């Protein structure tokens, strides 16, 4: 039996559940075209701010043995650049599945203005609101402030009527899973994306007795294999706590078909790849699809729905 990776997500059908994580291989229109023409099932734009941002000083992204450390600071070309791209692509490829569009304002008001621009546009895809960037100096992660998260979503859904998901930071306590899930269940969210990088880690070059990234005295977001257990826990925690209408996108530590299978088993509907995409380029999607299919066929599964969320307890 041949395994199918076909994935239905918010009334869209994708050939497979794989996509890039926002921030990786999606800064320029060239990179976005490469994603669109790759074996990825879907793709998402770089998190956009109102105006172009250079981000933090370099070095700000370093590959390390089991993953990466980054303190990018949201470099991007500004919302108009990405909105123009996705609108043109919609016209040129009207039958293609929906594009994901990411925004990450520096304040609630900026986020509201960015979302108003999307609401008023002809964009017919899926919007992701990033409430979890850990790498902008002086700007705390909104999603660690539960009251501020609720206030933000109250104001957003007062006017935003298009499909909207939010990107969350990792949580580490059952009480926090419970509190955040209760808040999110009050809103018509399309999905949550768990997780963003684990914020404010430190990697050290022993030879130089130095940190390896320049911003924030070397503190940066950790990605890759280091974060997979935390990512899986967050995917599972929200999958079991959120209304079934709110889907979960799994992000964190996916570099093989086995990693993908684990995320899906925990309940993920789609899968985003960051660190390993940065290392391998878009060819990773073809490899990881084959690996996932091989696992499914060895287990006798013909579709992802046969095992999604079916994690056994002991």
UniProtKB/Swiss-Prot annotation:
Pathway(s) annotated for this protein in UniProt: Pyrimidine metabolism; UMP biosynthesis via de novo pathway
Cofactor note: Binds 1 FMN per subunit.
Catalysis performed (reactions): (S)-dihydroorotate + fumarate = orotate + succinate
Principal location class: cytoplasm
Keyword Iron among UniProt keywords: no
Active site location: 132 (nucleophile), 133 (nucleophile)
Subunit structure: Homodimer.
Listed name of the protein: Dihydroorotate dehydrogenase (fumarate)
